[in-house]
C-alpha cells in the first residue's frame, strides 16, 4: 500500500461563479457548436451530445430521431454492413452517426469492412473498459493511421 501525504482538493475547495448572461430567456440559448478536430482538422457543427452505444440506445431508429436535433448516435458494436445498409438511403443522418468498435482484430476488420462500403461515417467510437491500457493507445494510433480524416 502507498500512503500519499500531500494535500488533496475536494468539492469544498472549488467555487463555481456564475457567468453574467446577456440572454433574456432560455429559449435564446443556442446549443449548436462548431468544433475543429486536432488530428484531422475537420470541422463539425451540431449539438455536442452523443447517445451511448448501448443496446436500445445506439440503434438506427434512435439515430433517425436524434439527427433531427443534430445529436450524434454511437451505433452499437453489433451493427454490420447489412444492418447499416437498411438506413443508408437516409442521407440526413450521415453527419450524426458514429461507428462503434472494440479493440480486437475482429473489431478492426469489421469497421474496415463497414467503412469500405459506407464512407459517410465521420466518427469512430472506440469503446473499451480501460482507456489507460497500452493496447488501447496502440489501437487508437492504428485507427488514426488508417482513417486520418
Regions found by a protein language model. Name each.
Residues 1-149:
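Active-site entrance/lid segments in N-terminal catalytic domains of soluble metabolic enzymes
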Amino acid at each position: 500500500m502507498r500512503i500519499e501525504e500531500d494535500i488533496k482538493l475536494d468539492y469544498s475547495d472549488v467555487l463555481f461563479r456564475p457567468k453574467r448572461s446577456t440572454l433574456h430567456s432560455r429559449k435564446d440559448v443556442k446549443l449548436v457548436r462548431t468544433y475543429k478536430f486536432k488530428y484531422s482538422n475537420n470541422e463539425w457543427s451540431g449539438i455536442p451530445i452523443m447517445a451511448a452505444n448501448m443496446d436500445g440506445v445506439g440503434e438506427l431508429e434512435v439515430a433517425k430521431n436524434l439527427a433531427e436535433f443534430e445529436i450524434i448516435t454511437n451505433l452499437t458494436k453489433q451493427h454490420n454492413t447489412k444492418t447499416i445498409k437498411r438506413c443508408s438511403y437516409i442521407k440526413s443522418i450521415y453527419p450524426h452517426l458514429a461507428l462503434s468498435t472494440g479493440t480486437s482484430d475482429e473489431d478492426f476488420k469489421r469497421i474496415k469492412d463497414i467503412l469500405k462500403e459506407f464512407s459517410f461515417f465521420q466518427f469512430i467510437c472506440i469503446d473499451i473498459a480501460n482507456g489507460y491500457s497500452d493496447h488501447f493507445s496502440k489501437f487508437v494510433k492504428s485507427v488514426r493511421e488508417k482513417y486520418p480524416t
